[in-house]
UniProtKB/Swiss-Prot annotation:
Biological role stated in the UniProt entry: Catalyzes the reversible adenylation of nicotinate mononucleotide (NaMN) to nicotinic acid adenine dinucleotide (NaAD).
Gene, per the UniProt record: nadD
Pathway(s) this gene product operates in, as recorded in its UniProt entry: Cofactor biosynthesis; NAD(+) biosynthesis; deamido-NAD(+) from nicotinate D-ribonucleotide: step 1/1
A Pfam family per the record: CTP_transf_like
Record's protein name: Probable nicotinate-nucleotide adenylyltransferase
InterPro entries linked: Cyt_trans-like, NadD/NMNAT, Rossmann-like_a/b/a_fold
Record organism: Aeromonas salmonicida (strain A449)
Alphabetical list of HAMAP family matching this protein: NaMN_adenylyltr (MF_00244)
CDD domains (alphabetical): NMNAT
Annotated catalysed reactions: nicotinate beta-D-ribonucleotide + ATP + H(+) = deamido-NAD(+) + diphosphate
One MF annotation (Gene Ontology) recorded for this entry: nicotinate-nucleotide adenylyltransferase activity
Length: 214
């Protein structure tokens, strides 16, 4: 018998904010996920180097997890000295959790660029994909992504409990137009980040003097 599925949310988290956390909370509640694992990247393959150090980003992720029941921090990617490829993390987790469905959480922007990911066609061998979709948005799917959805999309949340991997579930979420880039701009301008990220994270940023304008 399979255990309850868990959610996996990777990212640079520079800093972690409600645009990361709110969709994860929604997915946890909609799918009955046993936990959400926050997995900070060390060297993100598709992004520029982070503004903050790994230690600072980890500290912020720990603070955010402490404020959200059922959220835990997985540090494995920070301990690598090579790019943080999702497939490597999923393969390691599958070996550790052979009876637990894995739900990898991502935004629609990530799904649309999935064919550029390292070994992207193998991801669904190890996890389900849970994709945050802005209500009313009808994306123009690239051919490879459209074909992937045709084979793997489900609207049955319980299906993610019955199989270890292989489904794609599109989650309707509250529209949150916030990116880490925009948040860093607000912080650099000295604006109040209240309600855009956990209070403990905002306090840490202020105490450490992070994201200030040069």
């Amino acid at each position: 018998m399979l255990k309850a599925p868990i959610g996996l949310l990777g990212g640079t988290f520079d800093p972690i904010h409600i645009g990361h956390l709110r969709p994860a909370i929604d997915a946890r509640d909609a799918l009955g996920l046993a936990e959400i694992r926050l997995i900070p990247n060390h060297i993100p393959p598709h992004k520029a180097n982070p503004f903050c150090s790994s230690e600072q980003r980890l500290a912020m992720v720990r603070l955010a997890a402490a404020e959200n029941p059922g959220f835990v921090v997985d540090e494995r990617e920070l301990k690598r000295d090579k790019p943080s490829y999702t497939i490597d993390t999923l393969m390691a987790l599958r070996e550790e959790l052979p009876d637990t469905p894995l739900c990898f959480l991502m935004g629609m922007d990530s799904l649309l660029t999935l064919p550029s990911w390292h070994r992207w066609q193998a991801l669904l061998d190890y996890a389900h994909l849970v994709v945050s979709v802005r209500p009313g948005w009808q994306p123009d799917y690239p051919t490879k992504v459209a074909e992937l959805l045709a084979r793997h999309h489900t609207t049955d949340a319980t299906a993610l409990h019955r199989r270890l991997a292989g489904h794609i579930w599109l989650a309707d979420n509250l529209p949150i137009a916030l990116s880490a880039t925009r948040l860093r701009e607000l912080l650099a301008a000295g604006q109040d980040p209240r309600y855009l990220l956990p209070a403990s994270v905002a306090d840490y940023i202020r105490q450490q003097g992070l994201y200030q304008a040069d």
